[in-house]
Amino acid sequence: MSNFKLLATKLWVKILCPTWSFIVNCFYWLFRLNRLKKYLPIKNDYSYLTLNELMSKFKWKADNLKDWNPWVITIIARDLVDDCDGAAVLAKWWYKEHASEGRIVILYSADGKLGHAVCVREDNKEFVSNNEVVVLNPNNWEDDLMQKFGNKYSVII
């Protein structure tokens, strides 16, 4: 990935995507605000599931819009259907609910045309990719992560 493309990608990931995501989430709830109370108890129920149970309910679907990160309540309102960004957001929320932390890591191919979001637990011992929870070697987690995807990605943001 060229320096310019890498800089543009980092700008998108760190600044533009969160702004765009806020707009998309607000627009989504603008016409559904009256249903918000319905999803709060479901969110609470999901917090009692194991991570494997929760992620097994997740269904991957390609984005219709430019890439965006849904809020957890938005993912729940959409019946746990989203793309890899939604899965990473959901896993990060689950870790926080269970006194741990996770971070969203974005993987890109060398040419920048192929990208994927995952959530890596704070101790680097596991990551979540769509509906899978995968064990990592914490001492060499970056290389292990790349190998889990057959080395089709080479850039971590």
Where are these regions (language model features)?
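A structural boundary/capping signal
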Residues: 1-157
